[in-house]
């Protein structure tokens, strides 16, 4: 697809960005397939651990509080580092989606180096749990995970259908 876009767009230059996925995520806390459960039992990638350590003072409270409540461990499985809870499953799911979409984005940029973005369906209410909204997408709660996992995504964007425009945009600035 990107090869075709490049071929068609090279003379006009009208394409300004590529969106590898739209409102990514699943409506549950995680994928319970055998492959996913096996991956969930593996170590949290050091890329994420190092990102959290380096950016600890600026991490979103949702990630920071879960990490600190579980001892701010710097190695271990998703359950070991983040606890046996919905948040460890959400963080794991987010990592999987973000690294996959980053892979797609990096490949697209090798063919046609345009900016890429990923948008998300926003959390509607503060007490909504992952899966009420598409879990794994770049909602503000897990934006730090997206930043660590998806360096080839240039913009994380909210898909805004709520009235609190100013605060939502501030979350993504």
Show the residue positions of the predicted features.
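Polysaccharide-binding and catalytic clefts of secreted carbohydrate-active enzymes
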Residues: 2-143
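Catalytic-core region of carbohydrate-active enzymes that cleave or remodel glycosidic bonds
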Residues: 103-114, 141-173
């Amino acid at each position: 697809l990107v090869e075709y876009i490049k071929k068609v767009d090279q003379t006009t230059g009208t394409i300004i960005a590529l969106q590898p996925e739209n409102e990514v995520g699943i409506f549950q806390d995680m994928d319970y397939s055998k492959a996913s459960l096996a991956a969930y039992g593996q170590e949290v990638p050091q890329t994420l651990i190092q990102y959290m350590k380096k950016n600890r003072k600026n991490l979103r409270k949702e990630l920071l509080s879960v990490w600190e409540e579980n001892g701010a461990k710097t190695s271990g499985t998703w359950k070991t580092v983040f606890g046996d809870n919905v948040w460890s499953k959400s963080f794991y799911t987010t990592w999987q989606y973000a690294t996959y979409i980053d892979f797609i984005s990096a490949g697209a940029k090798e063919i046609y180096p345009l900016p890429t973005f990923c948008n998300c369906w926003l959390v509607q209410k503060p007490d909504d749990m992952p899966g009420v909204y598409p879990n794994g997408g770049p909602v503000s709660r897990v934006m730090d995970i997206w930043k660590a996992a998806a360096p080839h995504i240039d913009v994380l964007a909210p898909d805004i259908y709520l009235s609190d425009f100013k605060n939502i945009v501030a979350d993504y600035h």
